[in-house]
Swiss-Prot record:
Residues 1-9, 77-94, 150-187, 257-266 are extracellular. GO terms for cellular component: membrane; plasma membrane. Residues 31-55, 116-128, 209-235, 288-318 are cytoplasmic. It comes from Gorilla gorilla gorilla. Keywords: G-protein coupled receptor, Glycoprotein, Membrane, Receptor, Sensory transduction, Taste, Transducer, Transmembrane, Transmembrane helix. The chain crosses the membrane at residues 10-30, 56-76, 95-115, 129-149, 188-208, 236-256, 267-287. Glycans are attached at residues 167, 175. The gene is TAS2R7. Gustducin-coupled receptor implicated in the perception of bitter compounds in the oral cavity and the gastrointestinal tract. Signals through PLCB2 and the calcium-regulated cation channel TRPM5. It holds the Pfam family TAS2R. Gene3D superfamilies: Rhodopsin 7-helix transmembrane proteins. SUPFAM superfamilies: Family A G protein-coupled receptor-like. This is Taste receptor type 2 member 7.
Amino acid sequence: MADKVQTTLLFLAVGEFSVGILGNAFIGLVNCMDWVKKRKIASIDLILTSLAISRICLLCIILLDCFTLVLYPDVYATGKEMRIIDFFWTLTNHLSIWFATCLSIYYFFKIGNFFHPLFLWMKWRIDRVISWILLGCVVLSVFISLPATENLNADFRFCVKAKRKTNLTWSCRVNKTQHASTKLFLNLATLLPFCVCLMSFFLLILSLRRHIRRMQLSATGCRDPSTEAHVRALKAVISFLLLFIAYYLSFLIATSSYFMPETELAVIFGESIALIYPSSHSFILILGNNKLRYVSLKVIWKVMSILKGRKFQQHKQI
């Protein structure tokens, strides 16, 4: 029964992986082609491209971890290759979260309507410093990933082996305290960008409320371009927050799996839920971006035209 559930979850993970690769590769390809064509890239496109690349890597690492657990359990428990996988999973995990937070911050400074001198100063300079902010996210993610992965990997693999050797059970219980502290460190590290994103969300709501009130007083209506920009930004941010909560819970399941009787099943279940976040959020970003939405509709229209042409030719031959 457990093998059937594992196979079902593995097929689900492959489907989520395929959808996520399609959406994120589309974002990266469109922005890179536009970059080559114009020989420059906008700040928003740079953030979206960085986010898409990090999520493609994250999707590949999660799926690789799933296949290794199911097909090569001995390598998963003892192989040195898993240290590399765990490091890149932790790295791409933090990169994708921090890049999404940078997107929320960028929306806040570019769309928000505040008149505080510090806000206006940052609003004017955000395009100049965004590349340095992204680089800082990379450095911070590497700094977090190196020590945390080493400790978490050693504790987790040891307890996976303890599932098969009863004489190691007591030692595994001793290591649970160290494992819990490492896990707490990783979770707190991901909560920081979540709090920053949540703050940007509430400030955008406040900005939208002030803007609508100003439009009502001037009797110009509420559906102006600034209001539309606020709404699109809020949709992107709130979708990230909700998906991140689901991803955070799945991360807790995966990292706490050796407390459970079915360790392998718990890991695959957690990872299948984790794949929802990097897979689905890319399509929300596509729908919220005018350029990406236009290109996607254009591609869909061309594909439908080709399919209709083939059906017409087949019908004509019959």
